[in-house]
Amino acid sequence: FTRLYWGLRGRKFMYPGRKDTVKACIYVKELVCFMLYRLEHHEQGVELYNCTFEPAYTIEQIVATMNKVTGLNRTAPLIPAWILMPAAAVIGCLGAPMGICPARVRKLMVSTNICGKKLADSGYHFHYTFEEAIADWFKDNDNQYLK
């Protein structure tokens, strides 16, 4: 979420096409805790897990949490896809070093809504809520910025 933080902080973040895009995620410290848990409670065979908070969060919920935890209190406009995609194509053709191109914009508008129900039902107890994860990440950076 580092790019999101800097985009919000610099007032450069806009919702690309919609606010309800689901972005499944997990805090890296939580992932490590879960992996250690599975090593201790491993049954025979191979098990696959989608490691994500369950239910997954929308970009609007992620932005609201980022604002709350970091104290940014930024609003972000919604740019309709019919405006954003052609603009991204033009910016991409100009070779502007903004990291904006149609493929990246499309990726931002597509939900990564993977199901974390198996992890949630595994007996593992999360150490962090989503809000606590963002707060811990921010604290690790002296409550000043995110690296």
Q: Would you name each region that the model predicts?
A:
Residues Y37-I100, I134-K147:
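Mid/C-terminal beta-alpha module of Rossmann-like enzyme folds, strongest
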Residues F1-C33, M66:
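NAD(P)-dependent short-chain dehydrogenase/reductase
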Residues F1-T2, E60, N113-G116:
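Short, surface-exposed alpha-helical segments at coil->helix boundaries
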Residues K19, A24-V32, H41-H42, L48, ...:
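Conserved loop-to-helix N-cap of the C-terminal "lid" that shapes the substrate pocket in Rossmann-like
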Residues R74, F126-H127:
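Residue-level detector of short coil/turn "hinge" positions at structural boundaries
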Residues V28, A64, A87-H125:
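Conserved C-terminal active-site "lid" loop/helix of NAD(P)H-dependent oxidoreductases
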